[in-house]
């Protein structure tokens, strides 16, 4: 009996995955005019610790940003934006401020730029996330663009360089999110596990999502 139930669950997860991808693709076409669903492997995993480009589902992003109160003065950056699913979601939700994405893989960044160029409030940067100044932004987001060692280096960069407080959204945080839990200036506002919504599985496995604030020493 248990084997039958396991088979049914497995088939339902597969059907859920196909349905969610179909829904996401339809949303992409409406907002971007192209699909953002295809995974792109990173050529920089071994050298720079950069993970591949995958698109977080719109339903997952609804939960990630649930309750967010964005303002016209907000400046948002998605670190490791890939083809721009987070950017597309923010457009759908009528984000009132400035939206930026930075992507290390030039080909992926160009794909994102191609559809995003028609929106005046979006800027897509093709480049290394370790080489820009984050004082231009007050909201940072990432969907696990780095392996744990590089995530730690990125956090240390923020702590060294930021001169004003930020809000930080971290999706797929289970590998390295704990690194910032007890560091000075960091405060967790919320954490949740995302796996199912509307009766459908959102991902292959449950994913952690946390929301933080960071206040630099000069602002405490």
Where are these regions (language model features)?
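Conserved SAM-binding loop
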Residues: 112
